[in-house]
Design a protein with these regions (language model features):
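Auxiliary alpha/beta "docking" domains used to position bulky ligands
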Residues: 1-186
Length: 186
């Protein structure tokens, strides 16, 4: 399970990050449609600073191996098409969720409180029973204690945070793609 213990000072906060979800060039489809996304997501710099231990949990996906694997079954398929379909899949998100839940289960130290910042949008209500977030209906969040904020939704610049840790990201990803989550303990 890949994770790094980091310092609070490694975490790069910037309120402008919350505007990345909605600007003239891009609008995330979850912006304004989830209790855990901007504009509803709170800026959590002060809250996060009250915690004492921080772990960046991540999943690294080997894109080259993935392309080779797909090409073995579909030799005529172009690399661009393989990568395009990869980004549309929830594969990495599911892998990171597994890593985060494993890390939390295996964490042995005592703590009073825990804050987990996931990747992407909150998916707690994306299940057969609930089907969707209540945000658009105007009803309150069904599971306020289980709400999943992403690092970006609360104002963390993930790219700068990762750079602070000397992890090199490729844009666009050619060899490896990453997903990150942050687990904080008091």
């Amino acid at each position: 399970m890949p994770y790094i213990e980091i310092r609070y000072s490694d975490i790069s906060f910037d309120p402008k990050v919350q505007t990345f979800c909605h600007n003239p060039k891009f609008k995330c489809p979850n912006y304004g449609h989830s209790w855990a996304c901007p504009p509803e997501a709170p800026y959590l710099e002060k809250v996060v600073s009250s915690f004492r231990k921080f772990y960046l949990v991540y999943y690294q996906f080997d894109l080259k191996s993935y392309v080779k694997q797909i090409k073995a079954n579909h030799p005529k398929r172009k690399e661009e098409k393989i990568l395009g379909s990869f980004y549309a899949k929830a594969l990495m998100r599911d892998y990171l969720e597994t890593e985060l839940l494993s890390f939390i289960d295996e964490y042995q130290e005592d703590y009073e409180e825990r804050l987990v910042l996931w990747d992407g949008y909150c998916r707690v209500c994306n299940n057969p029973k609930d089907k969707y977030c209540t945000y658009d209906s105007g009803k309150p969040c069904r599971y306020p204690d289980k709400k999943r904020y992403s690092m970006e939704a609360v104002g963390i610049n993930v790219n700068d945070t990762v750079k602070n840790l000397q992890i090199e990201l490729e844009w666009p990803p050619l060899n490896y793609a990453y997903r990150f989550g942050l687990v904080c303990f008091k």
